[in-house]
Amino acid sequence: MLYARKISEDGWFGKEALDADSVSELGTKNHELSVWKVSDAKNNIDVDRVALALALTLGKVSEFYMVLLDPCDLQSRYKWAVAFAPQDGDTRYKKMKGEHTNFVLDTFWEQGYLSEYIHQLIEDPNNYRYYDANSIKKMVYDALKAGDVEWEDIKFDGAWKKAIKEMEEVYGSLKL
């Protein structure tokens, strides 16, 4: 199984050397770093569901990158057995809440290993996905239409409400 983590363009891409900005993006709370389970990274539908769950943790619709992490590869490269702290995701995509967990990073060494690992992974575009705002808007529209995301969970958030309205103008009313 792989695990997805949101990363920023400014924090990671276009840098020859790993720097403090990249490392600081892997900040923890109680030594735990939020990640999402990806059961089949070759299945774009599965990966997109994780991306939508991650997007629906945010208060606004915005682009992001999502890197795919392999704990077995981390173990092999760094002799670090990643520990997990299960926790439901704080997402409005209720069906995906259980697909969230945390990596436990007890030391700066572990944070550093993970940072170096991500820095190396993103050299290959197959190890990350990019989602622009319009793709995310369309994904949430489709999820609402399919009944995977409930209108009640997002209707009071102005940014998401506006995004759905934009998609309805293009793809038709959802009659919510």
Language model regions located:
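ADP-ribose/NAD+-binding catalytic cleft of ART/PARP-like enzymes
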Residues: M1-S34, V47
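Conserved NAD+-utilizing ADP-ribose enzyme module
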Residues: L26-H31, D40-L176
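Short HxH-centered metal-ligating active-site micro-motif
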Residues: K37
